[in-house]
Amino acid sequence: MPLIPTENKLAIYRYLFQEGVLVAPKDFHLAKHPQIETVSNLDVLQILRSFKSRKFVTETFNWQYYYWVLTEEGIKYLRTYLQVPESVVPATMKKQASRPSTYTRSEETKRTGASGDFDPSFNRGDRRQGGDRRGGMGRGQYRTERSAPAPQQN
């Protein structure tokens, strides 16, 4: 691991433990990291490359951005390194509270389902009785009014 100032290392470790995830663009010349302003992007990339090799984070690379997520081993390591109590967990491990419903319907206004008067034969019309065919013509004998009559066979 390259020589990185201790303040930068601690800032990266604290941010990673607090959030549980870290995103960094693949830009080795970027002066400041987008989320951690006091640290260069190169420092973040180098530290998390080291974390990946020790299996403290899982890495995903997509569209020129690195995405790192802490693993259980990484949480244990950072907890001992930063001397954080067991009660403190990263934001990705916290359960989100269920959102309170802004609108609740009373029992009278709730829909109870179909009323039971659905009749599927209504949509079919009278096709079963041959209503979609011209009168008197059976299957395969359809012709338009303008067409000539079928030739007579002798």
UniProtKB/Swiss-Prot annotation:
InterPro entries: Plectin_eS10_N, Ribosomal_eS10, WH-like_DNA-bd_sf. Its main location: cytoplasm. Residues 124-135 have a biased composition (Basic and acidic residues). The keyword DNA damage does not apply. Keywords: Cytoplasm, Ribonucleoprotein, Ribosomal protein. Residues 91-154 are annotated as: Disordered. It is found in: Cytoplasm. The keyword Cytoplasm applies. One of its GO terms (cellular component) is cytosolic small ribosomal subunit. Belongs to the eukaryotic ribosomal protein eS10 family. This is Small ribosomal subunit protein eS10. The gene is rps10.
